[in-house]
């Protein structure tokens, strides 16, 4: 029996699904530009949202300059940011990652 490898992207091909990339951020000016650029390159049809959680640096400015939609969440804490993202954004597929470019 021959095995067939199916990638998730193959399952969604030609389905015109809306994809939202959600990036909760706090003081990520050093990395957020690269993170947004990398997601734009990998998922060119996705909408990229950066949720800034009271950053004191240029996180929001840099993310916006790279083409992300920036929203502010004034209630401090990642849990508040995540709840706000899923309340605000309507999409068929959600991709959430941190804005600090870490991969686990």
Model-inferred region functions:
Residues 2-104:
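Structured catalytic core of nucleotide-sugar glycosyltransferases
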């Amino acid at each position: 029996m021959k095995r067939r490898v199916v990638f998730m992207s193959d399952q969604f091909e030609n389905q015109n699904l809306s994809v939202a990339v959600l990036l909760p951020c706090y003081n990520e000016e050093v990395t957020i530009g690269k993170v947004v650029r990398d997601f734009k390159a990998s998922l060119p049809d996705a909408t990229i949202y950066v949720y800034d959680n009271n950053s004191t640096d240029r996180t929001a400015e840099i993310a916006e300059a790279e083409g992300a939609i920036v929203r502010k969440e004034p209630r401090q804490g990642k849990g508040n940011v995540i709840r706000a993202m899923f309340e605000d954004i309507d999409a068929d597929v959600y991709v959430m990652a941190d804005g600090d470019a870490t991969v686990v």
